[in-house]
Amino acid sequence: MARSHKVTKPKRQQVDTSGSYNALMVLMGDNVKKAEKRVEEEEPVEQELEEDDIEGAGEEEEEVDEEQEEEEDADDAEEDAEDDSETDKYDPYKLHFEAEEAKYVSVIKSEEWKTSSEKTKIGSQPVRITYTNLEDADELLDFSEAQKTEFSKYTVRPRIKDGFKQLNGSLTSVQKAIYPSLMAYRDLCYATSSLSDTEEFSRLVAMHIAQHVVRTAEEVAYNTRILKRNAEEGIHDVEFRDQGYTKPRVLVLVPTKNACFEFMQLLVGASGVDREDNKARFNKAFHEAGAVLDTKPEDFQKAFKGNTDDMFCLGVKLRNKSIRYYSYFYQADIVFASPLGLKTLVGSEGDSKREFDFLSSIEIAYLHETNHMEMQSWDNVLTVLGQTNLLPNESHGCDFSRVKSFYLDGLAKHFRQTIVACQFVTPTINSVFSNTVNFAGKTKITPIYNGELAVAGMKIRQIFTRFKALSVSDEIDARFKAFVQITLEGMIRSGDYSGTLIYVPTYVELVRLRNYMDEKNISFGAISEYSSITEVKRHRTLFRDGREKILLYTGRLHHYRRYFVKGVKSVVIYKLPENPAFYRELLLFLTHSVDEGTLEQSMAKCRALFTIYDLLALERIVGTKRVKTMAKSGESSYEFY
Amino acid sequence: MAKATEKRVKRAKKEESGSESEDNDAIAQEILDTTKSDNEEEEPKKSSKNYTSVEVDESEEQTKTFKDLGVIDSICETCEELKFTKPTPIQAQSIPYALEGRDIIGLAQTGSGKTAAFAIPVLQSLYENPQPLYCVVLAPTRELAYQISETFEALGSAMGLRTAVVVGGMNMMTQAVALSKKPHVIVATPGRLVDHLENTKGFSLRTLKFLVMDEADRLLDMEFGPSLDKILKVIPRQRNTYLFSATMTSKVEKLQRASLVDPVRVAVSTKYQTADNLLQYMVFCPFKHKDTHLVYLVSENAGNSMIIFARTKSDTQRISLLLRNLGYGAIPLHGDLSQTARLGALNKFKSGSRNILIATDVASRGLDIPAVDLVINYDIPSDSKSYIHRVGRTARAGRAGKSVALVSQYDLELYLRIEGALGKKLDSYPLESEAVMLFSERVAEASRAAIQEMKGEDGTKKRSKFDKKRRRDEMDIGEQ
């Protein structure tokens, strides 16, 4: 595995800056020694970081003839400019990023968000589409016009258009529903449990990213050429505001190396590049053959295929004809990273070495397979997003005369497009998505659910009990209380509770229940994502054989392993799983016992607690239709067969 | 004493140059010169000048209005709003020449209205020909830079003026951003401006039309010379340059020759010791009772705003703690404070929420504090120039003021030197020593507590930090 030569480049720059600092000190007739000391102090820190093994982090740029590349880009840009002028194209980029200052400022300041939603169908899948808009945002970019405009009328670089066509064919129904929001730089949240829909969505996103990166890079190169010519002729009054503080414009957060690799294939395909630099090295580090057991569910196979390393950061430079992996961050166009890998670079408050300047000018942030990242650690995602679009600490060679004015005014986050692709929307995703401030507005597409009640193929009693929680913060204690009172005590009193599987979402809830049951002398087994494999094996066996009557089982363990737990006679759900597939699988544990003959069908039962704060998860389990009647406050029980 | 000296306008054509017939640092001489010119003596100092020269006495009544000087209406209105009713002498003399497009050398002290004297012509020119990156003002200290930018902003508010302050000790990136927003006026300390010229890509002063050097003598004192040279090299030769200085040293003259073209020299002879409104006293006391005497003076003048000058930072810190322990609203101002803390301290004092400022010489010059009733010299400054500047904090703009110097047995020599420079003996401050000694016990206790507090917060770590910072404030203090 390639060791990362952490920030060799910045080191050089630091010496540079301290050099000029020295010079200044000399000018002031001051002692220079101190400045030297500063540099010395910093070096050990870097060595420390060199040992850190974040795959792909801060690679040093190999010898590249930047100027020649820029020239090529400028040539391409000139050609394209000719192409573009031929037809009347629809170009949302211009409307969004080159909006008139007075207008966007007034739109941003209004802060009046309006929401409307509609039910429609994408293909055969009924969906709900929610639009959230700022008042008057239409004056900048009329979204209805974006929707009316055909895909072929949008400005797309010819090479990308061809590449995308080859990769994708003509637009699918999913893509048709999405392209106006995506290409009009609206925030977009797309939830679907269908793998093929996800794939189609990703392809379109890859095309959009490629288009954004290539067009902006070419514009910069083209303008540089003009400036150079002007300088030769002694003209100084032309200026271009065409870039951010730092080069990277796109941030792609992916959970695993394999996901990164797969998305990269789409990007390469969609951008239609001829040349891939460092390809062998990238493939070696990110690609790994080998499938997951095919007995596991489909979405699990997809999520854990190939290289599941979740510690990497990768700078990618994308140009009209070539793509380069392992580009130095401050020269890259796209930063691919796992939340953990990027968080390690970004660091947290008080760390001696933090590096997040390269996130200052992100214009598109794409969260890929978001639910998986949620299971990894959502905090990392929040940290990383929190450090985007800030003023960098150092200039990193930025040409300030070309920085776009909305960066200078600190409004960059109002321009950033955030794209979230997920299987299902959870409260955490919702909170991130509703806190983005892109003035173009947002589009959220969620499926309408039929529910998972009938999927067991067998009549199973399913009881949903609503408890009362006054607020989100109160919910945790109220749930525990309700669980103990309604479920646990009655269960223990009845005496017959062998084969009870208690599903808790995370380790935190597991610990609380474990402590309580220890206190009450109730014997049980508990397995979580922190248990060793032997421990898990032992408890599963004991539970299957009926020697342990209760098994506590966490949702995160299920996410990472998808065990098939045997010997289940009753399922108790402490908190509904966000992933409806988990509920389906919990029911399958019961049907399996029935099939095996260890459980009478009439005795099989699944009990769940819920509150009004669980409606998103509940909707996916009982279906969109039923959830409405269940969405009330107060206590009540619902039984389904 | 305030007899209006007649205005002497002398126009001498550019004839010979290279006249370095000037004594370098005869400060006392300088002061004596100025006092002499008050007394209507013959033409002092600089025998050979290769420029138009105008001299005027500060106390002279101005009969002209801004409009008479040729200032355009919109700026006149702003002046009225800001209560600048009449031009001060330096403004009256320099603005007409400046509006003609001449370069200006101004010899004047802070408080004489010189900031507006250069701001108004710059703004007027900018008004007629709006363009970003129009003017650079160089100032020796951060505080002064902020004050200048405030004046510019106030005067230019009607025309939507944008200014940027670029000084050391603040975030380079924020400043780079401010510069790339293309301000009309940049107020800067030379070192940091050079830093930006060298390191901030995309920033240049190619279009500059005005250069103002404020307190040029201090700029040069603080070894900003090389930075100034660098700046002069990269800005266009086609420009107007204003140079303001308190004294005309040979260094300043060299700078003037290097940067100004056919300048008009406007000298305002400030009277340092106007007997009518500044009462200067001294208190002779034993060293060990210095604190007691100080507290007595403070308590006697309680309610008045005052500045106490001390020589060292730890003294300022100690005295402010001491006074606070005794219930007075005291606030220290010295170089160990961060930039924001300094501005904060100054603002608290300005707004009147604290009325005792204890300062090192950082604050002795360049700060425009509107009304101080009393200046106490806890230590006698080592040179008479500093003394003049310290007591110059009070009795400004025609108001009455008092200054008291605490002289201990160790300060005697310094004090005598100052008396010599002033050319007069100071009265002793009327106090009853018995009444003073009543304070001694409480003061001793408060002093002990103060020292204790200082030790408490002064760990070894902090010490090392202080050492680091020292270097930077030395440029503010401008010690010789």
UniProtKB/Swiss-Prot annotation, chain A:
Protein name: U3 small nucleolar RNA-associated protein 25
Purpose of the protein: DEAD-box RNA helicase-like protein required for pre-18S rRNA processing, specifically at sites A0, A1, and A2.
InterPro entries: UTP25, UTP25_C, UTP25_NTPase-like
Record's compositionally biased regions (Basic residues): 1-12
GO cellular component: nucleolus; small-subunit processome
Main location class: nucleus
Feature: compositional bias, Acidic residues: 41-86
GO terms assigned for molecular function: rRNA binding; U3 snoRNA binding
UniProt subunit comment: Component of the ribosomal small subunit (SSU) processome composed of at least 40 protein subunits and snoRNA U3.
Record gene name: UTP25
Biological process, per Gene Ontology: maturation of SSU-rRNA from tricistronic rRNA transcript (SSU-rRNA, 5.8S rRNA, LSU-rRNA)
Region of interest: Disordered: 1-22, 34-93
Keyword annotations from UniProtKB, A to Z: Nucleus, Ribonucleoprotein, Ribosome biogenesis, rRNA processing
Organism (species): Yarrowia lipolytica (strain CLIB 122 / E 150) (Yeast)
Family statement drawn from the similarity comment of this UniProt entry: Belongs to the UTP25 family.
Pfam family, any one: Utp25_C
Compartments where found: Nucleus, Nucleolus
Presence of keyword rRNA processing: yes
UniProtKB/Swiss-Prot annotation, chain B:
Biased composition (Basic and acidic residues): 1-17, 33-46
Molecular function GO terms recorded: ATP binding; ATP hydrolysis activity; RNA binding; RNA helicase activity
Cysteine-cysteine disulfides: none
InterPro entries named among the record's database cross-references: DDX47/Rrp3_DEADc, DEAD/DEAH_box_helicase_dom, DEAD_box_RNA_helicase, Helicase_ATP-bd, Helicase_C-like, P-loop_NTPase, RNA-helicase_DEAD-box_CS, RNA_helicase_DEAD_Q_motif
Annotated PROSITE patterns: DEAD_ATP_HELICASE, HELICASE_ATP_BIND_1, HELICASE_CTER, Q_MOTIF
Motif mapping: Q motif: 64-92
The EC number(s) this enzyme carries: 3.6.4.13
Single GO cellular component term: nucleus
Catalyzed reactions: ATP + H2O = ADP + phosphate + H(+)
CDD domains linked: DEADc_DDX47 (cd17954), SF2_C_DEAD (cd18787)
Chain residues that bind ATP: A108, Q109, T110, G111, S112, G113, K114, T115
Compositionally skewed regions (Basic residues) per UniProt: 462-471
Localization, UniProt: Nucleus
Residue numbers covered by motif DEAD box: 214-217
Record's keyword annotation contains Iron: no
Keyword check for rRNA processing: yes
Residues covered by the Helicase C-terminal domain: 277-437
Family: Belongs to the DEAD box helicase family. DDX47/RRP3 subfamily.
Domain note: The Q motif is unique to and characteristic of the DEAD box family of RNA helicases and controls ATP binding and hydrolysis.
Subunit structure as annotated in this protein's UniProt entry: Interacts with the SSU processome.
Function as written in the Swiss-Prot or TrEMBL entry: ATP-dependent rRNA helicase required for pre-ribosomal RNA processing. Involved in the maturation of the 35S-pre-rRNA and to its cleavage to mature 18S rRNA.
Protein's UniProt name: ATP-dependent rRNA helicase RRP3
Name of the gene this protein is made from: RRP3
